[in-house]
């Protein structure tokens, strides 16, 4: 199957086995989600995604207090992957991330490390063209597209797409970009994958609460790793592995969880002792 993405100045062809439009999306992950697509392991999928505001922000007058916050962070899907079941991992390789032409960033009241210096609320519109993000006439920088939300159905209950956890979700990891593979534990049959929250660029830390929030098109490949369940999502790049840990309110505990997952990976996959893993991560690992 071939699908096409129309861009200014031409048309980009997506060679994919399947396609899902952006209006097929969810606002929360749960075992009760009805899949919109069923695919085999190894399939490629072209997904359209909304920006995190679901099209509500078009001008700098569209500030956060004017938005319907129930319509934030939609995730395209869910996708049922045949053969995926608890005890496995689902690997999602990001082959392409093509943002649209306009995105937005915000200052949100009572949010972020510089809120005491900035006037809130505020919105800035960014234009994206030829791989460059333009903030204004004086400021531009290279686009580094990434996906904030990549997740599967959790073991129990319902988790909003705004949150992150062992199921993935709103990880906002800027390494979840083209060329990376995100490995996630499977908790429900079929995994029930959903993806969204594209950014044309996002700083590590996303200190105002937003990146360049933008819609666009994504090409992914899904693979089931039988009997190799991770405890937390792991992002694999060409030269590194990035582990994740999440808590509600304790940064040190989140760091501990991410470190434990990294050490476990070294012990199980490379034969490290826990002592060697501890020392290696201290001398060659980064916490972010």
Which residues make up each language-model segment?
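Short, structured beta-strand/loop micro-motifs enriched in basic residues and often containing a Trp
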Residues: 21-30, 68-76, 159-167
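N-terminal, Lys/Arg-enriched amphipathic/low-complexity engagement segments
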Residues: 17-67
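Conserved mixed alpha/beta catalytic, RNA-binding, or beta-rich assembly cores of soluble enzyme
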Residues: 143-252, 263
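Intrinsically disordered, low-complexity linker/loop segments enriched in Gly/Pro
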Residues: 96-178
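Short, Lys/Arg- and Gly-enriched loop/turn segments at beta-strand edges
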Residues: 52-63, 97-107, 190-200
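Bacterial Sec-dependent signal peptides at the C-terminal "C-region" and cleavage site
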Residues: 3-15
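A generic structural signal for residues embedded in beta-strands
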Residues: 47, 89-92, 184
């Amino acid at each position: 199957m071939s699908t096409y993405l129309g861009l200014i100045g031409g048309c980009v062809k997506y060679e994919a086995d399947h396609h899902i439009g952006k209006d097929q999306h969810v606002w929360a992950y749960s075992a009760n989600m009805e899949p919109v697509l069923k695919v085999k392991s190894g399939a490629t999928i072209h997904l359209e995604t909304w920006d995190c505001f679901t099209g509500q922000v078009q001008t700098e007058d569209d500030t956060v207090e004017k938005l319907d916050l129930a319509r934030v962070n939609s995730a395209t899907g869910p996708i049922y992957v045949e053969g995926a079941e608890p005890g496995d991992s689902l690997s999602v390789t990001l082959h392409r991330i093509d943002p649209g032409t306009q995105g937005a960033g915000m200052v949100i009241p009572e949010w972020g490390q510089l809120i005491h210096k900035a006037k809130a609320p505020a919105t800035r519109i960014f234009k994206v063209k030829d791989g460059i993000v333009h903030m204004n006439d004086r400021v531009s920088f290279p686009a580094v597209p990434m996906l904030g939300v990549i997740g599967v159905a959790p073991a129990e209950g319902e988790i909003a797409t705004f949150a992150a956890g062992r199921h993935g979700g709103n990880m906002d990891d800027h390494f979840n970009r083209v060329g990376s593979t995100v490995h996630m534990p499977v908790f429900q049959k079929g995994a029930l994958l959903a993806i969204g929250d594209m950014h044309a660029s996002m700083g590590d830390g996303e200190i105002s609460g937003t990146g360049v929030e933008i819609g666009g098109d994504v090409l992914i490949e899904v693979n089931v790793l039988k009997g190799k369940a991770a405890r937390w999502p792991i992002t694999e790049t060409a030269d590194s592995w990035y582990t994740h840990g999440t808590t509600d309110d304790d940064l040190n505990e989140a760091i501990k969880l991410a470190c434990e997952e990294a050490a476990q990976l070294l012990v199980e996959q490379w034969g490290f002792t826990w002592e060697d893993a501890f020392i290696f991560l201290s001398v060659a690992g980064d916490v972010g």
